[in-house]
């Protein structure tokens, strides 16, 4: 599963590539499963469509999905002075206390109060040196999630320039556990019909939860990957998923993660026996070439930003130079990149 490495694999500059703006998808494919699919199988690769997935997998394979749900985490409020403030919820430490990115952060000191359209209010309780953000305690009697639904907005990535996307298209069909500030985008390609066809072929499904957080928005700024620090993200591995993985292995099936977030959750919980420990945890796992995969054998993933930790994770499976060559070919063939773009299927053995 692991690709050969060289010293350039540890330099952030080695993960740069040119991407024409026309390749950045502004709308999702319709229907969901009509996106294109670049299949990497051993030393070969082919160009297919996502609806071909059942025929590309084997009966007895297991797909592990991230069931997190994107919350309306982008808020617009006012300070007592009348100045406007934009808030992005990142991570809770209590139901009504969240680490947030705020703009403008200047002059938003501890004790400052922000009002959100008379529905919610929050007070700054602490500054966060690591992120430059603020800890906010939200006030009010209304249920917090209900209030968020009233005043919050889906935090679409900054490279999406259109406002025409329906919020439900930025959720997977199985999204059930609120807490993410970005979607696990590999799951956006699955339609109800495709899920039914996968089940008919004997391909099983299991879930994990990883609430996608700040790390999605942070490029790797350091010169070397060795000095980059990932932002922590909350995850949970259900007992049923660990059992499904063990059963899949015992029957000769393969474990494929749907998305880098599912992969990071499983690998963060990995034990020496190749099974994930069950229960909740917090992941700061940074995967790049040289990483030894213990649970995940294959991956479904989108096309990622230059110099991103996600690009480095995928490079650990297929090799950096090969991955960048595949990306160049995808650009030439008109593939669509990023959150609403096309996908890759990396089958076990691609990095051999």
UniProtKB/Swiss-Prot annotation:
InterPro entries referenced in this protein's UniProt entry, alphabetically: QueA (IPR003699), QueA_dom1 (IPR042118), QueA_dom2 (IPR042119), QueA_sf (IPR036100)
Keywords: Cytoplasm, Queuosine biosynthesis, S-adenosyl-L-methionine, Transferase
Keyword Transferase: yes
Organism superkingdom: Bacteria
Pathway: tRNA modification; tRNA-queuosine biosynthesis
Enzyme Commission number(s) from the entry: 2.4.99.17
Biological-process GO terms, alphabetical: queuosine biosynthetic process; tRNA wobble guanine modification
Coiled-coil region list: none
UniProt cross-references to Gene3D superfamilies, sorted A to Z: QueA-like
Stored SUPFAM superfamilies: QueA-like (SSF111337)
Gene Ontology MF annotations: S-adenosylmethionine:tRNA ribosyltransferase-isomerase activity
GO cellular component: cytoplasm
Annotated disulfide bonds: none
Catalytic activity from the UniProt record: 7-aminomethyl-7-carbaguanosine(34) in tRNA + S-adenosyl-L-methionine = epoxyqueuosine(34) in tRNA + adenine + L-methionine + 2 H(+)
Similarity section: Belongs to the QueA family.
Database matches in HAMAP family: QueA (MF_00113)
Subunit structure: Monomer.
Role description: Transfers and isomerizes the ribose moiety from AdoMet to the 7-aminomethyl group of 7-deazaguanine (preQ1-tRNA) to give epoxyqueuosine (oQ-tRNA).
Name of this chain's protein: S-adenosylmethionine:tRNA ribosyltransferase-isomerase
Organism: Gloeobacter violaceus (strain ATCC 29082 / PCC 7421)
Organism ancestry: Bacteria, Bacillati, Cyanobacteriota, Cyanophyceae, Gloeobacterales
Record gene name: queA
């Amino acid at each position: 599963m692991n690709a050969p490495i060289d010293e350039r694999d540890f330099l952030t500059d080695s993960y740069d590539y040119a991407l024409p703006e026309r390749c950045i998808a502004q709308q999702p494919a319709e229907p969901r499963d009509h996106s294109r699919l670049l299949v990497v199988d051993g030393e070969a690769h082919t160009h297919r469509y996502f609806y071909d997935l059942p025929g590309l997998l084997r009966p007895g394979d297991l797909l592990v999905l991230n069931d997190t749900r994107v919350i309306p985490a982008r808020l617009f409020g006012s300070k007592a002075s009348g100045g406007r403030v934009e808030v992005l919820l990142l991570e809770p430490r209590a139901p009504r206390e969240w680490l947030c990115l705020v703009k403008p952060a200047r002059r938003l000191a501890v004790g400052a109060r922000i009002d959100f359209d008379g529905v919610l209010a929050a007070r700054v309780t602490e500054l966060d040196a690591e992120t430059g953000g603020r800890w906010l305690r939200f006030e009010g009697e209304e249920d917090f999630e209900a209030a968020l639904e009233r005043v919050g907005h889906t935090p679409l990535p900054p490279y999406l320039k259109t406002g025409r996307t329906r919020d439900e298209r930025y959720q997977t069909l199985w999204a059930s556990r609120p807490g993410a500030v970005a979607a696990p985008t590999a799951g956006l390609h699955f339609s109800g019909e495709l899920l039914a066809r996968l089940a008919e072929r004997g391909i099983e499904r299991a879930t994990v939860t990883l609430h996608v957080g700040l790390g999605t928005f942070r490029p790797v700024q350091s010169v070397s990957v060795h000095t980059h620090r990932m932002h922590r993200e909350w995850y949970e591995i259900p007992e049923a998923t660990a059992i499904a993985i063990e059963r899949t292995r015992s029957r000769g099936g393969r474990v494929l993660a749907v998305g880098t977030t599912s992969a990071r959750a499983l690998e963060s919980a990995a034990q020496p026996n190749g099974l994930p420990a069950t229960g909740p945890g917090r992941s700061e796992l940074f995967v790049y070439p040289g990483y030894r995969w213990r649970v995940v054998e294959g991956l479904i993933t989108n096309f990622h930003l230059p110099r991103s930790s996600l690009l480095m994770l995928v490079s650990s499976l297929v090799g950096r130079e090969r991955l960048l060559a595949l990306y160049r070919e995808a650009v030439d063939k008109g593939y669509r990149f990023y959150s609403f773009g096309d996908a890759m299927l990396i089958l076990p053995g691609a990095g051999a």
